[in-house]
Each structure stands twice: as structure tokens, then as C-alpha cells.
């Protein structure tokens, strides 16, 4: 195995963990591409991405083009003369000129077992859909959306209480060693490229705040999965009327109970064991929630000052 000169492209913390693995390896990271700094926090100060922060700690040149479609940006990247470009949650579309610039092209770490869950939110959608397992795929990028040839897959089960946050953490542990295996075998072509079967593909649509609103006409099982899939963002919520004012309450944890005899959206019970709400099928038992302006709390703490919010028989 010879040392590879690598361009790394990524933006969030998930990507930074892969960059760290490359920095700890025998390979040479010659440049980092990441999204432009964005306003964050109350002061709306410009904040560097986790990938940029890590790169600067290691004195690696950082490039932050708004787009890679322009010829000057493409020429700048090509001039780096990299062996390979590694792309992890970068957030920009790579034109064909960029994909073909490095000697071995561009490799992508994708958070699903392709061709299942192509697109922006594979980790969240695997929980949302009730998948039993997921994993990461290292693929050779092409001009399609997550359609490139697959080089390596690593699988992991999805636990019954898995949230997107916990699954992100799990995949962030699994993926970097898998990436290094592929990089170490690039020269010898140790990993044979496997075409994706488009007939088995589906699309992992971005999450939206609107989708996070709990719809009592869904089943309790689906709502419970939504609560886990939408944690840490955008967090599921319900709305209810209190003294003529609509209140929004975020929901962090719930479980499913089988019995039900009332119309969907009816409060069946509210005590220290949970707030039970009838759904289209089954009962959603909410155990951790967050009123506006407060921290997440147990159902008992919530009901201590707000018992009337979820009166038995109330229709949400």
C-alpha cells in the first residue's frame, strides 16, 4: 500500500470524524473542501464547520467555494493533483469535471445500505420506515444522486429505541474503518465495484418541520418511529388548545400500547406512566416531552403544573 494524496470534502461533525481517521492514517490529506461559514447562534456570527475547524488545527489548506460548477473552481481543484477525493456529507453537487479530476476519482461514504435510501436523509428514513438494519456504503461517485458503483458495505442492526442521534453515532464509529479499508485497497483493486440495482432503490427525502407534527390518523407504531427518527432534528411535536390558546409541545419519547376504543386524537389517560392518546391504530403513550420555553421533562413533571392540558376525553 502506498500513501495516497487525498482531498477531503465534508461539512458536519459526522464528516469531521472521517477526516480525523484520515489524519490518523498513513495517508496524506492535502486539502479540505467544506461549506462556506454560516451565521449561527443568537448573534448570528459566522461559524466555521466542524470539518474546517479540524483542518485548521492541522494546518491543512481549506477551500470553501459556494459552487464547484465554475471552471476556475474546477481548475483549482484539479491543480491539487490528488490521488482520490473522499466526500462525506459535503453538501455541494460535484460536476463531472470534479468527479474525474483525481486519479482514482471520488469516493463517497453514504449512511445506508445502497441502493436503499439514496438521498439527503438516509439515517433518519431508515428509522422512520421501521428498517431492522442499516449501515454504510463506500461507493465510487458518478453524476447521479447516490447511484455510483458500490465498493464496500458494513451493516448494523437498528435497535428498538434507536434515535437518529444514536444511529449517527453508531455509523460514525463504523464508517471510518470501512473507508480506510477501501483506500488501502485502491491501488490493488481489492474491492470489486458492484452496480446498484435501481429497482431496489428508494429516496430518503429531507425532513421538514411540518412533517414532525404528530398526525393522530397515523398508527401508533408509525408515530413512535417518527419521534425517534426526528430526534435530534426537527423533534416531533403536537399542538393542543389550552384556555383558548394553541400550545405546541415537543415529544421526545413514547411507546406503543395495543388497546384502543376511541377516536384518533382522544386523550385516554394522563398520569406518571404516560399520556395515552388514541391513534388510527393502537395507543401512543408519551413519556418525555417539552413545553415551549422549557427543558425536556418527564411526563410526571409536565403534569405537575399542567394536568388540565391532557384531560381524559380531550380531543387533540
From Swiss-Prot:
GO molecular function, one term: methionyl-tRNA formyltransferase activity
CDD domains: FMT_core_Met-tRNA-FMT_N, Met_tRNA_FMT_C
Its EC number(s): 2.1.2.9
Enzyme class, first EC level, given as a word: transferase
InterPro entries assigned: Fmt (IPR005794), Formyl_trans_C (IPR005793), Formyl_trans_C_sf (IPR037022), Formyl_transf_N (IPR002376), Formyl_transf_N_sf (IPR036477), Formyl_transferase-like_C_sf (IPR011034), GART_AS (IPR001555), Met-tRNA-FMT_C (IPR044135)
Alphabetically ordered keywords of this record: Protein biosynthesis, Transferase
Residues reported in the UniProt entry to bind (6S)-5,6,7,8-tetrahydrofolate: 112-115
Pfam family, one: Formyl_trans_N
UniProt cross-references to PANTHER family, sorted A to Z: METHIONYL-TRNA FORMYLTRANSFERASE, METHIONYL-TRNA FORMYLTRANSFERASE, MITOCHONDRIAL
Family: Belongs to the Fmt family.
Protein name, UniProt field: Methionyl-tRNA formyltransferase
Top-level taxonomy: Bacteria, Pseudomonadati, Pseudomonadota, Gammaproteobacteria, Pasteurellales
Amino acid at each position: 500500500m502506498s500513501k495516497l494524496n487525498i482531498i477531503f470534502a465534508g461539512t458536519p461533525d459526522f464528516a469531521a470524524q472521517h477526516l480525523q481517521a484520515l489524519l490518523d492514517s498513513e495517508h496524506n490529506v492535502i486539502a479540505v473542501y467544506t461549506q462556506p461559514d454560516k451565521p449561527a447562534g443568537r448573534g448570528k456570527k459566522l461559524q466555521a464547520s466542524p470539518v474546517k475547524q479540524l483542518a485548521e488545527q492541522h494546518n491543512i489548506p481549506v477551500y470553501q467555494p459556494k459552487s464547484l460548477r465554475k471552471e476556475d473552481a474546477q481548475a483549482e481543484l484539479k491543480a491539487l493533483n490528488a490521488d482520490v477525493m473522499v466526500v462525506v456529507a459535503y453538501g455541494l453537487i460535484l460536476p463531472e469535471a470534479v468527479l474525474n479530476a483525481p486519479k482514482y476519482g471520488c469516493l463517497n461514504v453514504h449512511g445506508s445500505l445502497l441502493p436503499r435510501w439514496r438521498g439527503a436523509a438516509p439515517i433518519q428514513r431508515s428509522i422512520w420506515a421501521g428498517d431492522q438494519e442499516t449501515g454504510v456504503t463506500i461507493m465510487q461517485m458518478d453524476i447521479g444522486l447516490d447511484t455510483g458503483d458500490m465498493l464496500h458495505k458494513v451493516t448494523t442492526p437498528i435497535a428498538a429505541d434507536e434515535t437518529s442521534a444514536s444511529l449517527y453515532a453508531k455509523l460514525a464509529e463504523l464508517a471510518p474503518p470501512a473507508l480506510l479499508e477501501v483506500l488501502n485497497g485502491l491501488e490493488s483493486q481489492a474491492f470489486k465495484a458492484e452496480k446498484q440495482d435501481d429497482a431496489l432503490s428508494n429516496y430518503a427525502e429531507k425532513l421538514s418541520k411540518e412533517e414532525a407534527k404528530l398526525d393522530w390518523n397515523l398508527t401508533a407504531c408509525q408515530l413512535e418511529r417518527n419521534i425517534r427518527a426526528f430526534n435530534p432534528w426537527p423533534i416531533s411535536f403536537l399542538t393542543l388548545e389550552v384556555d383558548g390558546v394553541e400550545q405546541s409541545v415537543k415529544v421526545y419519547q413514547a411507546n406503543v400500547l395495543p388497546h384502543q376504543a376511541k377516536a384518533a386524537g382522544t386523550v385516554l389517560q394522563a398520569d406518571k406512566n404516560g399520556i395515552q392518546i388514541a391513534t388510527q391504530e393502537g395507543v401512543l403513550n408519551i413519556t418525555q416531552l417539552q413545553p415551549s420555553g422549557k427543558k425536556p421533562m418527564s411526563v410526571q413533571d409536565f403534569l405537575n403544573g399542567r394536568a388540565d392540558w391532557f384531560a381524559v376525553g380531550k380531543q387533540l
